[in-house]
A protein has these predicted regions:
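Divalent cation-coordinating acidic motifs and surrounding scaffolds
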Residues: 2-317
Length: 317
């Protein structure tokens, strides 16, 4: 773009002799570059746009909460955990809703295919209505389960269709004792590997609780180690505990085992607080009640620090 000079064109002056003398205007009053002016204007618009964007981001952060989905196996071997959840759910809600701003809770229960059970999955969408959640837990029956594998893949598919908020953090706590079916064994051809990858892309973190007697909760995360977000190598036919380890590790969650059935309550609260960034606050509140550290909560806190470090190294926010 060429430079444009603006000059004053002064009128001609008369000499005493009557002839005209044109006043030279060889000193430009102002020189400016049109491209430069346009660039500055565009820059101003960009800065203004960035300022609006930053304000919107701050506004979103101020209202950011947690979408927590409890996903549980209710087949026969898991009935004791369902009983605990029925009995302790009000306590869980009281703690979490006081601790975590803008919290919503959803529930997905699953059984198995073709085993005469009353359902394959039952879904309660994310809500703040505690009475509705409690009614869902009390009103959903246990089942029996058919083969060794359970309909985990169907529950994961339901999680993909959950009414997630665009603003909130997305967290799943999956508790069970059996792996999903492979694609060929699922009547609906649900592929748990691809569904898990899709959930990860939707920024859903899957924390797992492997429910088996005598399980060392500290070792669960080491049973199948994989980088966060690494879906380059397909997994299949993993053992039950290895599956629960893999799906947590690959989505940036925590895998933990249960030593005693009652531990499930502390673990659910700990996982939710961890994903909401409220683990320290929960620890303080629990210490007031128990007067001693809760081992599962201490472990979750330690694992959360390691995962955050990994995420930073991998470039995840």
């Amino acid at each position: 773009m060429e430079k444009v000079e603006t000059k004053l064109h002064l009128p001609a002056l008369k000499k005493p002799s009557g002839s005209l003398v044109v006043k030279k205007d060889d000193k430009p009053i102002k020189t400016f570059n049109i491209a430069s002016v346009q660039k500055q204007g565009a820059l101003g618009n960009v800065l203004k746009g960035d300022s609006i964007k930053q304000k919107m981001q701050k506004e979103q952060q101020a209202h950011k909460g947690l979408d927590l989905v409890l996903m549980g196996d209710l087949t026969g071997s898991m009935s004791a955990y369902h009983a605990i959840l029925k009995r302790k759910f009000t306590e869980i809600c009281t703690t979490l809703f006081q601790l975590i701003p803008n919290l919503r809770i959803g529930i997905i229960f699953y059984l198995d295919h073709g085993s005469g059970d009353p359902y394959i999955t039952k879904v309660q969408p994310l809500t703040v209505n505690v009475e509705q959640l409690q009614s869902f837990i009390l009103g959903t029956p246990d089942g029996y389960g058919g083969d060794e594998d359970e309909a985990v893949e169907d529950a994961l598919h339901d999680a993909l269709e959950m009414n997630w908020s665009e603003i909130n953090t997305h967290s799943v706590v999956l508790f069970g004792d059996a792996r999903p079916h492979e694609v060929s064994a699922c009547p609906y051809q649900h592929d748990y590997f691809k569904i898990t990858e899709s959930l990860f892309k939707k920024q859903v973190t899957i924390n797992t609780v492997y429910c088996s007697a005598g399980c060392d909760y500290r070792r669960q995360s080491t049973l199948y180690e994989v980088e966060i977000g690494n879906f380059s190598r397909r997994v299949s036919r993993l053992g039950n505990p290895e599956f629960f380890s893999w799906i947590a590790n690959v989505t940036g969650g925590i895998a933990i085992g249960v030593e005693q059935i009652d531990d499930i309550v502390d673990i659910i609260k700990g996982m939710a607080a961890k994903d909401a960034g409220k683990i320290d606050e929960l620890e303080k509140e629990e210490l007031k009640i128990t007067l001693r550290p809760i081992p599962a909560l201490v472990h979750i806190k330690e694992q959360a620090k390691l995962i955050e470090h990994k995420k930073k190294l991998l470039g995840y926010k």
